Structure formats: structure tokens, C-alpha cells
Amino acid sequence: AEETSFVFSKFKPLEPNLILQGDALVTVAGVLQLTNVDSNGVPEPSSLGRATYSAPINIWDSATGLVASFATSFRFTIYAPNIATIADGLAFFLAPVASAPDSGGGFLGLFDSAVGDTTYQTVAVEFDTYENTVFTDPPYTHIGFDVNSISSIKTVKWSLANGEAAKVLITYNSAVKLLVASLVYPSSKTSFILADIVDLSSVLPEWVRVGFSAATGASKGYIETHDVFSWSFASKLAG
């Protein structure tokens, strides 16, 4: 399809248009819970979950040279019982159709090595809560663009509002290869924005899966929740 669009105003258990991997599930309240919590709602360590849209997305077309522009928006919350020990983060990603959850923890389920590799064919916008020095993370919670590597090509400081709902808008303008991500906390009226040039057609396969991936830390205390409340996406191949 040259155009794809979908809207989840809330999620439903056994949602046919979602592929859930790892620990991801939809709660009876209609929340996409990417990582495990115990019976008291406390997040658990060493949890990894992903959720992608059921249909592949046509991001570019080799026959015509057309590349898709897209816009996606979602609302999510990260809650950590102890803000001093939080890990590891959530990402929106585009990856090959056969992509499976990779290493958890700081790799966020998207990569399995600190070394970048073009065979990943993956682009992600990470909302990273833990400084993995081996990935050259900055020493604060941050938003980053990941292109075939967990080591971001560009980051911006993000002040995590613990337990507050964040509204994210990610857009890609294929005409100028501009990727933009913004995060707003309506409750505190704070906002963060990151933009860079990324040539998706040189990184991604023609057809991709789009969705979310999240992971908690391996150590007992390095935990947080990763809950997505709503998600919309629209893409269109354009010259």
C-alpha cells in the first residue's frame, strides 16, 4: 500500500492488529504494558517487551524511487518506584519485517552489540532513562536517534516526569530527509525536541515493521514501567 494509517485510541486485549513479543501485553484497562509488573504493579527487572503493527509498512520503493513521509503520535508513561535507580527506556522503531526482540537492558530489545552494524536495518527514537557509558550515552535521561546502533547519532536532554503522561509526535519528511521527535508533558507544560537528517531509504529495507520496544534493568532496583495509552500512525509514499 502506498498509504497506511491506523489509530489505537486505546488498546484491547487480544488486539488482532498488534503483534506482541516478549513480555508485552494489553491490560484489561486497555493499556499496552511493554514490560512486566508484579501483582502490586511494581515493575520487575530483566523484562523486555515489544509491540508492532500487524501489517508491514512500505517505507520506500526501489522501482519508483519514492520514499515515504510519516507521522506517528502516542501517549506513554514511565513510572519508577525509585527515581535514583531507573532503567532502561522505551523506543519507537522501524525495523525489518522479520525482526525479533534482541538483547534487553540498555539495548532496549533492538540491538545485541554496542557496535553498530548496517545489517540491523533499524531506525529508532529512544527515550532512554539510563546512562550506558559503553554506548556513549550522555549522563542524563535523554531522547536519541538510533540508526543501526544503540549509540545514538544525536541526543537531547529529557527531564523525565516520573509517572506523568507524555505526548510524543515523530515526523519524517522524505523530501528533505528530516526526522523530528517532540515530547510534551501537558501537566507540567514542558517540552523537548530533537531533529536530524536521516536517509531512511539507505538504512531501512523497503518494507518494515513499526512499533515499540522497552526494557528494564538487569539489576534488582533498576526498574520502571513502560505503558503506552494510545497510538496513531500515517505514512505515504511521495516523490
From Swiss-Prot:
The keyword Metal-binding appears for this protein: yes
Residues that hold Ca(2+) according to the record: D128, N132, D137
Coiled coil: none
Binding-site positions, D-glucose: D88, G106, G217, A218
Key word ATP-binding present: no
Residues holding Mn(2+): E126, D128, D137, H142
Organism domain of life: Eukaryota
Pfam families, per the entry: Lectin_legB
Annotated keywords: Antimicrobial, Calcium, Fungicide, Lectin, Manganese, Metal-binding
Gene Ontology cellular-component terms listed: protein-containing complex
Single biological process term from Gene Ontology: defense response to fungus
One term of GO molecular function: manganese ion binding
Subunit description: Tetramer consisting of heterodimers of alpha and beta chains.
Alphabetized PANTHER family for the sequence: CONCANAVALIN A-LIKE LECTIN FAMILY PROTEIN (PTHR32401), LECTIN (PTHR32401:SF45)
Record family assignment: Belongs to the leguminous lectin family.
Physiological role: Galactose-binding lectin. Agglutinates human erythrocytes, and requires Ca(2+) and Mn(2+) ions for full agglutinating activity. Has antifungal activity against Fusarium sp., A.niger and A.flavus.
Protein name as catalogued: Seed lectin beta chain
Source species: Spatholobus parviflorus
